[in-house]
């Protein structure tokens, strides 16, 4: 799953809202992400300490991915951002005004997958705040960044299915064998010779017939004249 810059926070619970920023604690940001936003001033959405990854994913639903995000831009009463890479993004995405309070844009997110604990006696491994020390959100893919993978086609199976059994065709007694090149050459020579000889024979036959006719006529005329 790929996460775009404009991943929408859908909320982990029905009562989730954006908390007001608290004062920085001594020593900088901490590592907590529990009730009351303990120890980390960069986290706006608080989650219960005993919330598991499975429960959090169930709150996200089937259309969103439970994620841990490093950067967050929150929307309050004013949602217009007119400069920088996020110019106008909040206003166009979730609308301007106080109705957008509690929502935000998240960046640098990685998904939180449900994993089977190594030891059944240590369910703490499945707690959300043990897997993510930053902002926990439900992120939805951008349609422009969705990736689809075509099904893998077994080309070997296709070639095997469409391959012609040439050995069976050549061994079949019904189908005649293809003529060799020598036979074709001999047949071509015979046909050429026949085309040359046939007109000559026809001319010879015609000339001999005419000669016999003239001989018969001459003999008859001579016989009549003689009589």
Curated annotation (Swiss-Prot):
> Which residues are tagged as glycosylated in the record?
50
Show the GO MF annotations: structural constituent of cell wall
Where, per UniProt, does this protein localize?
Secreted; Secreted, Cell wall
State whether keyword DNA-binding applies: no
* Cysteine disulfide links: 60-138, 68-132, 69-109
**Which keywords does this chain's UniProt record carry?**
Cell wall, Disulfide bond, Glycoprotein, Secreted, Signal
Q: Under the cellular component aspect of Gene Ontology, which terms does the record hold?
A: extracellular region; fungal-type cell wall
Q: Which residues form a coiled coil?
A: none
Q: What is its main location?
A: secreted
* Keyword check for Secreted: yes
Supply the name of the protein: Class I hydrophobin A
Q: Organism, per UniProt?
A: Penicillium expansum
């Amino acid at each position: 799953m790929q996460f775009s810059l404009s991943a929408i926070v859908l909320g982990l619970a029905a009562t989730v809202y954006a908390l007001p920023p608290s004062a920085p604690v001594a020593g900088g940001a901490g590592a907590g992400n529990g009730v009351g936003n303990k120890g980390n001033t960069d986290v706006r959405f608080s989650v219960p300490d005993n919330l598991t990854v499975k429960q959090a994913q169930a709150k996200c639903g089937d259309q969103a991915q439970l994620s841990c995000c490093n950067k967050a831009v929150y929307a309050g009463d004013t949602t217009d951002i007119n400069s920088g890479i996020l110019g106008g993004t909040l206003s166009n995405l979730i609308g301007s005004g106080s109705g957008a309070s509690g929502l935000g844009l998240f960046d640098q997110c990685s998904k939180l997958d449900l994993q089977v604990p190594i030891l059944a006696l240590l369910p703490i491994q499945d707690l959300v705040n043990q897997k993510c020390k930053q902002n926990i959100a439900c992120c939805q893919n951008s349609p422009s960044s969705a990736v689809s993978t075509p099904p893998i086609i077994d080309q070997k199976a296709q070639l095997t299915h469409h391959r012609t059994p040439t050995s069976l065709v050549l061994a079949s007694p019904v189908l005649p064998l293809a003529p060799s090149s020598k036979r074709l050459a001999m047949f071509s020579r015979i046909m050429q010779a026949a085309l040359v000889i046939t007109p000559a024979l026809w001319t010879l036959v015609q000339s001999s017939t005419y000669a016999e006719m003239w001989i018969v006529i001459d003999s008859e005329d001579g016989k009549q004249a003689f009589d």
